[in-house]
């Protein structure tokens, strides 16, 4: 937790989390509990001897693919609707405790379907947790369904068939559509037709881009997939013209500075382009990505960013205001969160004096 003088301010800020993989909130303790409940045999690997050993291994990822190996192994314990509800609700409790007022969460149906767990099971559990969180915790939640880019494109079309058949793009179940997984070998253009089908429903579109691939992947995502948001966007800092375009179009980057360090996409947090984004007027939010695997939930990420960059109250106001304004909740909800933010800014305005 950060020790700066703005610590109380960061705690008080109403937050929106827009880059959060719900499967990435699976803490080792819950992993072991669900494995036992569901009779799932974990790998014969010393790191699976205890929650502490597994967590220690999570602290030594060497790449995105190294992380994904453990990420997909971890989710193998999620079997029933109640498992998904428990997973999500535990995250919502943690998030609400860190003053997250609105969360837009990713989930990966294809990874579960491949294990024999139906899309309907997954989404039912997440929707149940969403409704509980909104009723009991006062946090609003939207679901972003994601395709896995490392799988054959026809499998993504098959998932879209299911989503269209269920009517979930139109009945409020799903608010966004995104794409995740290994990036470099799977350029955005491969999925142009998949995204075009979803675009016809009016659903918000996003994709992971520029995490481990060059800026051209971000540009291609904007041009071919017609996304209104970029998840990560780290590589945008390498292209001044792209930064100008992102700023001019108010394209939000759901930035995850700590996970970029955890996966060795950045040598250290000080190398994150936080200042570059601020100076260019690029809208970005600060997010935790897969906090159970990277060891930092959103409050801790805020604090690490603050300790590294010594941002002003004005800087944080820019970050949070842009994130709220470009969120996918209702206009009424945006106004509520912005009002809360203005009250916090007024209380802590002397910090910039």
Swiss-Prot record:
Q: Could you tell me the EC number(s) of this protein? A: 3.5.4.2
Q: Which GO terms are recorded in the biological process aspect for this UniProt protein?
A: adenine catabolic process; hypoxanthine salvage; nucleotide metabolic process; purine ribonucleoside monophosphate biosynthetic process
The source's superkingdom equals Eukaryota
Gene Ontology cellular component annotations, sorted alphabetically: cytosol; nucleus
Catalysed reaction(s) here are: adenine + H2O + H(+) = hypoxanthine + NH4(+)
Molecular-function GO terms, alphabetical: adenine deaminase activity; zinc ion binding
NCBIfam families, per the entry: aden_deam
Q: Any idea what this protein is called?
A: Adenine deaminase
Species whose genome carries this gene: Gibberella zeae (strain ATCC MYA-4620 / CBS 123657 / FGSC 9075 / NRRL 31084 / PH-1) (Wheat head blight fungus)
